[in-house]
UniProtKB/Swiss-Prot annotation:
Belongs to the radical SAM superfamily. MoaA family. This is Probable GTP 3',8-cyclase. HAMAP family: MoaA_A. The keyword Iron applies. It comes from Aeropyrum pernix (strain ATCC 700893 / DSM 11879 / JCM 9820 / NBRC 100138 / K1).
């Protein structure tokens, strides 16, 4: 296993397999790879093949990576996505983030290929609000996707990005649906990446709008394996994950991932602005499979060496998070006198859970 200069291990590879999407969400972060929106289906040709992903999976696993998340765009648009799942499943757990629209057609085959779980982006269950967010009237299709995934035996977590003035009141409706159908719920603040950078000030809604009531309902508070997410387990058994990345050093403390774009570049962070170590270039050079695996390992190590937390605690008082301009005078440890509410429950004491 390898770790970065701040002691954070590299355990997860987040892979965008396509920039295409059948929706057009106005806040899409596009995995940090571009500030423009997704491409239309049929307008892009794959850069990396199934064999390439097999080599990437083996190289990553040799370095200690044991988890792969497939994203896009919309990963289900890619026709060979089940084959990509199958090769990566040889090396670790494979999960996927999807809008769910195509899950009724593909959930069963993905389960057979080795997919363990899905995150379904469902920011509203109102047809009108869903269309305002995604620019398509497709909420019924997305809901059918959730049901298809559950029927196929996949673990399901629904992602809801809180948007001020649009869907704040819908969280509790989604929670009731989660309890009825048996999926978990993840509430996310808008990321200042991709399109989200331009709309952050207008639409960001801190998740404390739901957290206070959640905390009074919960039977247990846990910590997610990735990003130190706060997780509230409710009496029904449903877990609600909270994702609040903005100006949150605790979130950065729990980052164990590198991102692979659809064109074969590696991003040490969703907010990264370059340089971009290229897996695609390493694979183009040919050679035996073993030679390719070693070259990809080298590129992954280069990306790991570039990993830096976006937000850290200031050394002199240990209380106020800031984005560093240099690595001097900063630390990535919980401060002794932290007063931020997000630290009050103690990340270090809450039970650690997968997912």
């Amino acid at each position: 296993m390898v770790a970065d200069a701040y002691g954070r291990p590299l355990k997860d590879l987040r892979i965008a397999v396509t920039p295409e999407c059948n929706l057009d969400c106005f806040f899409c972060h596009m995995e940090g790879a571009t500030e423009s929106g997704p491409m239309r289906p049929g307008s892009w040709s794959p850069v990396l093949s199934v064999e390439d992903y097999d080599i990437i999976g083996e190289a990553a696993s040799r370095l200690g990576v044991d988890s792969f998340k497939l994203t896009g765009g919309e990963p289900l648009i890619r026709g060979d996505v089940d084959k990509i799942v199958a090769v990566l499943a040889r090396y670790g757990e494979v999960s996927m983030t999807t809008n769910g629209i195509l899950l009724p057609l593909k959930a069963s085959s993905l389960k057979r290929a080795g997919l363990a779980r899905v995150n379904v982006s469902l920011h509203s269950i109102s047809e009108e609000v869903y269309e305002k967010i995604t620019r398509r009237r497709a909420v019924k299709l997305a809901l059918k996707g959730v049901e298809a995934a559950l029927k196929a035996g996949l673990r399901v977590k629904v992602n809801m990005v809180l948007l001020r003035g649009l869907n704040e009141g819908e969280f509790w409706r989604l929670l009731r649906l989660a309890e009825d159908l048996g999926f978990d719920l993840q509430v996310i603040e808008v990321h200042p990446a991709g399109r989200g950078r331009k709309v952050l000030s207008s639409f960001r809604r801190p998740i404390d709008v739901v957290e206070e009531r959640l905390s009074s309902m919960a039977v247990a508070v846990e910590t997610g394996r990735l990003h130190n997410r706060r997780v509230y387990r409710l009496p029904s058994g449903v877990r609600v994950y909270l994702v609040d990345p903005v100006e949150n050093p605790v979130f950065c403390m729990g980052c164990y991932r590198v991102r692979l774009t659809w064109d074969g570049r590696l991003l040490p962070c969703i907010y990264w602005k370059g340089p971009y170590p290229s897996v695609a270039e390493a694979l183009k050079r040919g050679g035996s499979r073993e030679e390719k695996v070693w070259r990809v390992m080298k590129i992954l190590l280069e990306a790991n060496a570039l990993r830096r937390p976006t937000y850290l605690f200031r050394l002199h008082d240990g209380q106020e998070p800031q984005a560093p301009s240099t690595g001097r005078g900063l630390r990535l440890t919980l401060p002794g006198k932290a007063k931020a509410e997000r630290l009050a429950y103690s990340t270090l004491k809450a039970p650690l859970i997968e997912g």
